[in-house]
Regions:
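N-terminal periplasmic/intermembrane-space "pro-region" immediately following the signal or transit peptide
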Residues: 4-56, 192, 403
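Outer membrane beta-barrel
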Residues: 38-71, 75-207, 223-238, 318-330, ...
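Sequence/structural signature of outer-membrane beta-barrel proteins
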Residues: 58-67, 107-111, 140, 202-208, ...
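Transmembrane beta-barrel architecture of outer membranes
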Residues: 87, 116-118, 182-184, 224-228, ...
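Detector for outer-membrane/organellar transmembrane beta-barrel domains
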Residues: 230-339
Length: 403
């Protein structure tokens, strides 16, 4: 019964849900306002076309604890280190007829279905109501919804991006709390310049799948999709989708957010995953602050014959401050109950970094160091298992160019 009540609550979210909205960064990569690169538009301004580019190149260092390493195969503590290209995005965005926005972008650094990073169009019937269709960011988490290239640190919080640990050997069941990009349809809008809403239906298969592969839920008898909604309250006007921008050092904005989703028959039809998140973000002149807390429940479908469900908690606090016009210092404290609330122990992950914005050329340098610590576990085995696959010490130096 509780499952059906949860679905019903999400179904009525369009009546009350409110969400973040910012016109200048609708494509999630660069501004339409013409600050980066160039824009082609008609004299009336009803047709706008803007090509854009974002390239990130990083040097990475990762050191892993001995647990999980097989010395017989000469596995080293230092691994997954060297140079990488997280994003090489080429795309175009724009507006047509004064009410239709569109975006298409390719991430050449990805593979498979993830090559198509975004592909959507958005019809704004009025400021309070618009419909978006295609591949875009799901309405969950301030960290994910921040404009790509304007994040405080080059790595997402581990509590959002890392898979949880389940006490079963099911290789196909590796959920993480963040939902990221997906294919679907969403209604959204802005009310009284303070409230907004996003409510959508998505495949729930993530950024790497561009095909229709879903069915009906055998247990709940509804389409096996991701049902998601997000609301925010911005008392001082729309919060910019940035975590640090040297051209926006006179802002005074604050955001409070609530989001939730149910992914029906996710993980290859093995689980029903429920997520809830709380958000806070603040921009006050040179200062940026943000905090998020999120919860995920993983319940198995009847065909798995596993009666237990598992709960996971995570969250982070982060802040940045411009100590000079183009130099931002950054810090984050991330915490993750990766092995579930039934077992004691958390990962706690402090990180520090800095961002330098080169004048007049759209270059950005980011530096970050993170330590993954473990606290409160009952046994040494639990402690060893909790950070499997995660680097104990990691450092990243990334150079980014956009136009």
């Amino acid at each position: 019964m509780k499952k059906f009540l949860s679905v019903a609550m999400l179904a009525v979210l369009p009546l009350t849900a409110m969400a973040q909205h910012e016109e200048d960064t609708e494509n999630g990569v660069v501004s339409l306002a013409g600050r980066e690169g160039f824009t082609i538009e008609t004299k009336k301004g009803d047709f706008v076309f803007k090509p854009y580019l974002l390239v990130q190149t990083s040097a990475n260092f990762n050191w892993y604890d001995d647990e999980g390493l097989d010395k017989a195969y000469n596995q080293d503590n230092i691994a997954n280190s060297g140079f990488s290209i997280p994003y090489a995005v080429l795309g175009f965005t724009g507006k047509a007829f004064g009410k239709v926005a569109f975006n298409l972008s390719i991430n050449a650094a990805a593979s498979g279905g993830a090559l198509l990073q975004q592909a959507w169009f958005d019809v704004q019937l009025k400021k309070q109501f618009a419909v978006r269709v295609g591949k875009f960011k799901t309405p969950f988490s301030h960290a994910y919804l921040t404009t790509l290239g304007e994040t405080l640190l080059p790595q997402l919080p581990v509590s959002l991006a890392s898979s949880v640990i389940l006490p079963y050997s099911l290789n196909a069941v590796t959920p993480n709390i963040g939902t990221g990009f997906d294919l679907g349809v969403e209604i959204h809008g802005l009310v009284a310049d303070k409230f907004g809403y996003e409510v959508g239906l998505f495949n729930g298969t993530g950024a790497s799948v561009n095909t229709a592969s879903k069915t009906m839920s055998d247990d709940w008898h509804i389409p096996s999709l991701l049902y998601a909604g997000r609301l925010t309250y911005m008392p001082k006007g729309v919060m910019p989708s940035t975590q640090g921008n040297p051209n926006r050092l006179n802002e005074d904005k604050i955001l409070f957010g609530l989001s939730g989703s149910i992914n029906v028959e996710s993980e290859n039809e093995s689980t029903n995953d429920t997520r809830v998140g709380l958000e806070f973000a603040l921009l006050k002149n040179k200062l940026y602050l943000a905090a998020e807390a999120y919860y995920m429940n993983v319940g198995f479908t009847k065909r798995q014959k596993i009666n237990e469900s598992y709960n996971f908690l995570g969250g982070y606090v982060q802040g940045g401050y411009f100590v000079a016009p183009r130099l931002q210092l950054a810090a984050r404290y991330d915490i993750f109950n990766r092995n579930g609330t039934d077992d004691d122990g958390f990962l706690n992950m402090p990180a520090v970094g800095m961002n330098y914005f080169f004048r007049g050329c759209n270059l950005k340098l980011q530096v970050m160091y993170q330590y993954v610590a473990r606290w409160g576990h009952d046994t040494q085995l639990d402690r060893d298992n909790d950070n499997l696959g995660l680097a104990t010490h990691s450092a990243t130096v990334m150079l980014q160019y956009t136009f």
